[in-house]
Each structure stands twice: as structure tokens, then as C-alpha cells.
């Protein structure tokens, strides 16, 4: 049985107190522990893990959808995937010392189960599923946002493969109902080493300039500068 002190410490860490302590116990119980019980009455956390995975996806998706209204779908998907991945969940699990509270069988304990990424990630999902069952959607949303927002923000700052042209077009369409135009100003250099200069125009005004080794890269640079101009 999980000690009351241990339960209270974990609840304090996630800032949520369970009405039904059995749900917390179940969330922390690995199947290796359940299998070693003679009466087999200790449920493992796999069902709660299934539920927590779904709830986490919804809450994180909704948060990044609200917080980053100008990011294209591909970037939203990238951020969510990074945050809810096994690696992302393991980072959260280690931050709250979740491994210290897990109930493991003897074999899993000997093999270092408390530090295994897969176990930490699965138990993290089970814990969120337990919060949802105990307190409902608003409760689990608050827990998830408190734990995950810093990691979401970090993932959002990693602008891997950002399509600035798409982002600029979506921003201008949403705000003004119109799209930008890209104007090639000049191209310099020999064919094998050309440099292009492009301006992003909107309703007759230049809102960004960019240079690149191709017209596409120059347009992306111009769109990036235009976005920075709009955010000033």
C-alpha cells in the first residue's frame, strides 16, 4: 500500500488532492506488481494509461491551438508530438520524481524500472487519467497546463522547418481578409551562384525584404521579416 505520506507528497507536487485515493494507487501500480499479488486484486495502471493518453492529447492540442493562433497545422502537430512523446513525458516524470512512487514487481525493481523511460511515460499518462476520473476535465486540464506549459513553450521556440510564407498568409487573411504578394527586386551573380532579393508587399506597401540563394528562400526571408514587422 502506498504510504499516506508518499501520496501527500505527490499530490502536493502536482497540486491536486484525490478524493478517491484508490485511483492514485492504481495509477502508480505497474502490472509487474499486480502479477506478484497472490489474490490478484490490485489493478494495474494500463487502463488509466489509455485514458490519460487521450486526455493529454486533447488538453495539449487545445492549449497550443489557443496560444499560437498563427501557427500552421504542421507546426502545431510538431509541438504536440514533441511534448506528448515518450521523451517529453519522461522529462515531466523525472521532474516530479514519479519513479519514487511507482509500485513495481521485484524483477522490474531489480532491473532499474524506476528510471525506465517507458515506465515513467506510461505512469505519467496513468496519473493524468486518474486525475480526470477523480476530478473531471477542468482538474486534469489545470494539472497538465501547470506541468507541461514550460515544455510547450520550449518546443514552440524550436522553429524547425517553419514555413514563414504560410504563417504570413494565414496572419494577413485572418486579420485583413487578403494575402501578400512577392516581388523579385533583382538577381545577381552567375547562374550557378545567384543571389535573389525579394520584397513582400501587402496592399501596395512593402512589409518585408529578404535575400537568398533561391527565389523560394528569399521569399521565406521576406515573409519572416514581414511577420516581425507585424508583431512590433
UniProtKB/Swiss-Prot annotation:
Q: Which residues bind Mg(2+)?
A: 49, 122, 125
Protein origin, superkingdom: Bacteria
* Annotated InterPro entries: dsRBD_dom (IPR014720), RNase_III (IPR011907), RNase_III_dom (IPR000999), RNase_III_sf (IPR036389)
One GO CC term on file: cytoplasm
Q: What is its EC number?
A: 3.1.26.3
Query: Which GO terms of the molecular function aspect are on file?
Result: double-stranded RNA binding; metal ion binding; ribonuclease III activity; rRNA binding
**Pfam families documented for this protein:** dsrm, Ribonucleas_3_3
Task: Enumerate the CDD domains for this protein.
Answer: DSRM_RNAse_III_family, RIBOc
A Gene Ontology BP annotation from the UniProt entry? regulation of gene expression
Question: Which family is annotated?
Answer: Belongs to the ribonuclease III family.
Assembly and partners are described as: Homodimer.
Query: What job does the chain carry out?
Result: Digests double-stranded RNA. Involved in the processing of primary rRNA transcript to yield the immediate precursors to the large and small rRNAs (23S and 16S). Processes some mRNAs, and tRNAs when they are encoded in the rRNA operon. Processes pre-crRNA and tracrRNA of type II CRISPR loci if present in the organism.
Recorded protein name is: Ribonuclease 3
- What gene is this protein a product of? rnc
Amino acid at each position: 500500500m502506498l504510504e499516506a505520506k508518499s501520496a501527500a507528497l505527490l499530490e502536493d507536487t502536482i497540486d491536486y488532492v484525490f478524493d478517491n485515493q484508490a485511483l492514485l494507487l492504481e495509477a502508480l501500480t505497474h502490472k509487474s506488481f499486480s502479477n506478484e499479488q497472490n489474490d490478484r486484486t490490485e489493478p494495474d495502471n494500463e487502463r488509466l494509461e489509455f485514458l490519460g493518453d487521450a486526455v493529454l492529447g486533447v488538453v495539449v492540442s487545445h492549449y497550443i491551438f489557443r496560444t499560437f493562433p498563427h501557427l500552421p497545422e504542421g507546426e502545431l502537430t510538431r509541438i504536440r508530438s514533441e511534448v506528448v512523446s515518450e521523451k517529453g513525458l519522461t522529462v515531466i516524470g523525472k521532474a516530479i520524481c514519479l519513479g519514487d512512487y511507482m509500485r513495481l514487481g521485484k524483477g522490474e525493481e531489480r532491473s532499474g524500472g524506476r528510471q525506465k523511460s517507458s515506465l515513467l511515460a506510461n505512469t505519467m499518462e496513468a496519473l493524468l487519467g486518474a486525475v480526470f476520473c477523480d476530478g473531471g476535465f477542468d482538474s486534469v486540464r489545470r494539472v497538465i497546463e501547470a506541468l507541461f506549459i514550460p515544455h510547450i513553450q520550449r518546443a514552440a521556440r524550436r522553429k524547425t522547418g517553419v514555413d514563414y510564407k504560410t504563417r504570413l498568409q494565414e496572419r494577413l487573411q485572418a486579420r485583413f481578409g487578403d494575402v501578400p504578394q512577392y516581388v523579385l527586386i533583382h538577381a545577381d551573380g552567375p547562374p550557378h551562384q545567384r543571389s535573389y532579393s525579394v520584397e513582400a508587399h501587402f496592399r501596395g506597401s512593402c512589409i518585408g525584404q529578404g535575400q537568398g540563394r533561391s527565389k523560394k528562400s528569399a521569399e521565406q526571408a521576406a515573409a519572416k521579416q514581414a511577420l516581425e514587422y507585424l508583431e512590433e
